[in-house]
Amino acid sequence: MKFSLISVFLFAVFLSNENIFQAIADNRYLPTIFKNPVNAEQRSEAVMSSSLTNEEESRNWPHRATRNTLEKGQKRSPAARSEIEEMEEYDDRWMW
């Protein structure tokens, strides 16, 4: 009974969104409280403008910071290449 009530509520919330196809594309399943939701371009610009410094990035995501420093190097050893590939596989596995 609880499951059906919760699922009906979530479905109603999902349908109450003004632009349902935008919500599906952006993975925004719950409606916003604003009348004019921010579109994907505005969100990506905000994210790009608030990019982290290398120090903050290395503190938050050490494997990404390592990849960035390795990519900036002029010559990479085979071990460095394999490390970059492993990190990209890790990102792909856990980001999606």
Curated annotation (Swiss-Prot):
Q: In which tissues is it expressed?
A: Expressed by the venom gland.
Keyword Transmembrane helix found = no
**Cellular localization per UniProt:** Secreted
Q: Keyword Signal: yes or no?
A: yes
Look up the signal peptide feature and give its range.
1-25
A single GO CC term, please?
A: extracellular region
- Source domain of life: Eukaryota
Write out the ranges of the annotated region (Disordered): 45-84
**Keyword line:** Secreted, Signal
**Family listed:** Belongs to the non-disulfide-bridged peptide (NDBP) superfamily.
Q: What is this protein called?
A: Venom protein 3.1
| Source species of the chain | Lychas mucronatus (Chinese swimming scorpion)
